[in-house]
């Protein structure tokens, strides 16, 4: 059987960049790597309701800079910047170096694979029918300009005794084209019947030259103070 490689990993260095962009010598590398992991786990718990898509970590001159991509920057910043100040202090305690935090707003969360997959997972946990959640995600993405999208859920769908897969796809999703801007992510829905896996793959178009897939985002630097025909497939 043919197997699919992770669409994000295979495009690293071609049209996608790494989520940690820093260099270190042999002695410091393991320390920085563990520090990055702790920071990501801390932010994942602290910002669980802020619709965070990704975290980019940089380490310039004995400090750490974190760019948070979120659909709700107000939740991250907090009232008068109080929450972001707390995050900055906690991250400084974890890493042992001064921390800077910048926030990038995601204008169209319907085109972000991580946010879409988490949204579908949360709907499944609230007992919303999986077909309705999948169709809504597909239609919203196409309506906002996606060239193609594929959504797959697998597990005990609808409480069935036998686990199975179902997926919907609309438009093109060219996984073999390296210049294709493919956004891929997964999430898990913890239901009373068990875990249901959610996979989302979104094709936003082809990147030529120095075009950026995040061209319409707005950055914040907080200070201290149609309904179309959809393909369906079922596999037991």
Swiss-Prot record:
Recorded GO CC terms: cytosolic small ribosomal subunit
Molecular function terms from GO: mRNA binding; rRNA binding; structural constituent of ribosome
Family annotation (PROSITE patterns): KH_TYPE_2, RIBOSOMAL_S3
InterPro entries: KH_dom, KH_dom-like_a/b, KH_dom_type_2, KH_sf_prok-type, Ribosomal_S3_C_sf, Ribosomal_uS3_bac-typ, Ribosomal_uS3_C, Ribosomal_uS3_CS
Protein's UniProt keywords contain Lyase: no
Residue ranges constituting the KH type-2 domain according to the UniProt record: 39-107
UniProt keyword terms in alphabetical order: Ribonucleoprotein, Ribosomal protein, RNA-binding, rRNA-binding
Gene Ontology annotations of biological process type: translation
Family label: Belongs to the universal ribosomal protein uS3 family.
Record note on quaternary structure: Part of the 30S ribosomal subunit. Forms a tight complex with proteins S10 and S14.
Role this protein plays: Binds the lower part of the 30S subunit head. Binds mRNA in the 70S ribosome, positioning it for translation.
Name used for this protein in its record: Small ribosomal subunit protein uS3
Organism for this UniProt entry: Wigglesworthia glossinidia brevipalpis
